[in-house]
């Protein structure tokens, strides 16, 4: 019988060298994300979001990235969810993209800020109708007695707002403003390539690049 200790893959698809890396991490992320899209990976926009609650207990979940620019990485959620409460007391978080088919990870750490109401309104209006209704119907992370309760709420919201539900006040965007971004490329014999971008106001591009030992 195969044991967990025997499960392993020898990575060999690509390398990551300082000479080929972009001078700023957003350009490097854009390059890798486009390669993930070109490779037709299933949902390359999924990422793990890790937060810490008031009691110091960490939690993690998969969310979808909805925007990236030089300001940071944007996602949207219910502000009253567990992650919303975590971020209210500890506005620091970590993101992880894992593209196993390309043998790559991107690890991002930084502070969290809410997006503007205008940004949240604009994205909310672009969502499918069912998702907009669902944002009202679901008290995310709260205990409910049955699926029927959720479906009854969905029906009530649909009847109330029809085809034009407004954005709920408890729903909107967050932006992670990174202070470090690590790009990890799997290599043979577990001697992986790891390049860490650290925010540095004294550096010409605003970032320094360091190679980390695997």
From Swiss-Prot:
Gene3D superfamilies, per database record: Electron Transport, Fmn-binding Protein, Chain A
Q: What is its EC number?
A: 1.4.3.5
GO biological processes: pyridoxine biosynthetic process
Pathway in which this enzyme or protein is active: Cofactor metabolism; pyridoxal 5'-phosphate salvage; pyridoxal 5'-phosphate from pyridoxamine 5'-phosphate: step 1/1; Cofactor metabolism; pyridoxal 5'-phosphate salvage; pyridoxal 5'-phosphate from pyridoxine 5'-phosphate: step 1/1
Q: Which residues bind FMN?
A: 61-66, 76-77, 82-83, 105, 140-141, 184, 194
UniProt remark on cofactor binding = Binds 1 FMN per subunit.
Sorted keywords for this record are:
Flavoprotein, FMN, Oxidoreductase, Pyridoxine biosynthesis
Catalysed reaction per UniProt?
pyridoxamine 5'-phosphate + O2 + H2O = pyridoxal 5'-phosphate + H2O2 + NH4(+); pyridoxine 5'-phosphate + O2 = pyridoxal 5'-phosphate + H2O2
Question: Which pairs of positions does the record mark as disulfide bonds?
Answer: none
One example of the protein's molecular function in GO is:
pyridoxamine phosphate oxidase activity
Source taxon at top rank: Bacteria
Obligatory cofactor(s): FMN
Q: Which residues bind substrate?
A: 8-11, 66, 123, 127, 131, 190-192
Q: Name the family.
A: Belongs to the pyridoxamine 5'-phosphate oxidase family.
* Oligomer and partners: Homodimer.
Functional summary from the UniProt entry:
Catalyzes the oxidation of either pyridoxine 5'-phosphate (PNP) or pyridoxamine 5'-phosphate (PMP) into pyridoxal 5'-phosphate (PLP).
Q: What is this protein called?
A: Pyridoxine/pyridoxamine 5'-phosphate oxidase
Originating species: Burkholderia orbicola (strain MC0-3)
